[in-house]
Amino acid sequence: MESNTNVPMRNTSLCYLEKDGAYLMLHRIKKAHDLNQDKWIGVGGKFERFESPEDCVLREVREETGVTLTQYRGIVTFILDDLTEYMHLFTATAWTGTMIEGDACSEGVLEWVPKEQVNGLPIWEGDKIFLKLLDEERPFFSLKLTYAGDVLQEAVLDGKKM
């Protein structure tokens, strides 16, 4: 088996805030050259030096939404053409602070979307898998998603191909 020691890796966090049967979704339309351009995702971002998953998600959610929260749910591994990304996935149903409204977020436009409508938005195919796992209230899971460009090639849940 070929070693992947030269493949870049990064750690990220992603959080889905839940309220009244809806997720707070971020429509990524503000940054040029964004891997998530025009897609709808939860809020989060890349780890800064010496951050834990919780540190990262707390900081990113506070920066993008103005609120403070935490609740760890699982880890998702993305294998992209020349990058491996470990995304630490969170959900939250309670927070403190004042929520940033609409397009005041520098990353895109924040909008509450009913859960049953999220899969109809332009989202990554793999996101549909882990959003289903979140809805099933799985306490912890390991999901590996392999992409070629924007196309999902393989999904492995808890070590088993889906």
State where each predicted segment sits.
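Conserved N-terminal beta-strand and adjoining loop/helix that marks the start
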Residues: 2-25, 46
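Short, solvent-exposed loop/turn elements at beta->coil junctions and helix N-caps
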Residues: 3, 74-80
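Short, charged/polar surface micro-motifs in flexible loops or helix N-caps
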Residues: 21-22, 31-32, 48, 92-98, ...
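Conserved Nudix-box catalytic region and its N-terminal flanking loop in Nudix hydrolases
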Residues: 23-59, 63, 77, 155-162
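A short coil-to-beta-strand element that immediately follows conserved catalytic motifs
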Residues: 66-75
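Active-site-adjacent beta-strand/loop module that shapes the phosphate/pyrophosphate-binding cleft
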Residues: 78-100, 111-112, 127-128, 132-139
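NUDIX/MutT-family hydrolases
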Residues: 100-133, 151-161
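Short, active-site-adjacent segments that bind or coordinate small-molecule cofactors and metal centers
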Residues: 134-154
